[in-house]
């Protein structure tokens, strides 16, 4: 968890200055996109929301214990507009910054997140590890951005639309190669090329309006999951990062993660699903 502590220290030490997501991601040894994704899965809130809560917590402390004007505190925590600071402050505390100066006012304090590994009698995670060759996928896609908070909202809308299209039926007809099923895949190539695919693993020609992508050969840890879509899949990712990965002897490979939704005979997606996450063996310290 060394890198986790370092990136957390970076955020806490820069609440009153500019926080670079790129620099935080470098500390975490991954892309900005994957860093935000990992943070959200582990903590349950977006990185942007966490930073906002921490800054507003510190701002409230300063307003109550010092004689600083509201504008001074707003500027310190990166808000050049009193209106935007007032809005952010009220979203966290439910009252205005001026009202917060009253000693009797009730405020919300969000402490810094402390990452640790807890030993519990929790439920088992069913998994197996497989080495697979290169995988070619074909399907439809929608662009994503580096802001994971925005993507969380846009991907479900993309699913809802795609399920009603002829293209989805074509994708279902391609689901004969491993991993068998309709695949949901986030693919990060660079900050300007991030896409979410609804696709299938296939050798078929690419139909008009669809795209192909090849995922290189790698080792996968595969988790089985009996829930439906977003809530259950995100739970698998959270447990992967917090419960499985720290003790496994592996590290995250940084390749696209795959959600696998098997298709039943009537062409609908079944509730049982799998999550495929690319991993690699940790380098031993010498």
Label every PLM stretch briefly.
Residues 1-5:
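Short, small-residue-biased leader/transition segments that mark boundaries at the very start
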Residues 6, 87-135, 149:
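…primarily DNA-binding HTH/wHTH and HhH modules…
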Residues 9-22, 41-77, 104-123:
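Terminal helix-turn-helix DNA-binding modules in bacterial transcription factors
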Residues 28, 77-78:
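Core residues of bacterial helix-turn-helix
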Residues 31-34, 80-81:
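Short coil turns linking two alpha-helices in DNA-binding domains
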Residues 35, 39, 84-85, 89:
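Short hydrophobic/aromatic patch on the recognition helix
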Residues 128-143, 213-226:
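Structural motif
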Residues 148-286:
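C-terminal regulatory/effector modules of DNA-binding transcriptional regulators
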């Amino acid at each position: 968890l060394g890198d986790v502590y370092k990136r957390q220290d970076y955020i806490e030490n820069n609440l009153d200055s500019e926080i670079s997501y790129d620099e935080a991601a470098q500390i975490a040894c991954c892309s900005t996109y994957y860093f935000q994704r990992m943070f959200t899965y582990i903590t349950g809130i977006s990185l942007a929301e966490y930073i906002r809560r921490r800054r507003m917590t510190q701002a409230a402390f300063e307003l109550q214990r010092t004689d600083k004007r509201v504008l001074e505190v707003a500027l310190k925590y990166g808000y050049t507009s009193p209106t935007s600071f007032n809005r952010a402050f009220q979203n966290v505390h439910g009252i205005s910054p001026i009202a917060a100066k009253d000693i009797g006012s009730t405020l919300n304090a969000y402490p810094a997140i402390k990452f640790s590994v807890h030993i519990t009698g929790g439920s088992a995670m069913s998994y197996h590890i497989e080495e697979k060759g290169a995988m070619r996928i074909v399907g439809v896609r929608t662009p994503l951005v580096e802001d994971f908070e925005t993507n969380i909202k846009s991907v479900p809308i993309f699913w809802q639309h795609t399920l009603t299209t002829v293209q989805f039926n074509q994708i279902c007809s391609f689901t004969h190669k491993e991993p068998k099923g309709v695949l949901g895949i986030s693919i990060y190539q660079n900050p300007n090329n991030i896409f979410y695919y609804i696709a299938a693993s296939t050798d078929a020609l690419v139909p008009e309006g669809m795209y192909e992508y090849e995922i290189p050969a790698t080792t996968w840890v595969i988790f089985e999951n009996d829930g439906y879509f977003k809530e259950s899949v995100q739970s698998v990712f959270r447990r992967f990062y917090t419960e499985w990965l720290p003790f496994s002897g592996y590290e995250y490979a940084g390749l696209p993660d795959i959600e696998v939704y098997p298709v039943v005979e009537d062409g609908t997606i079944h509730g049982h699903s799998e999550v495929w996450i690319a991993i690699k063996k940790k380098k031993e310290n010498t």
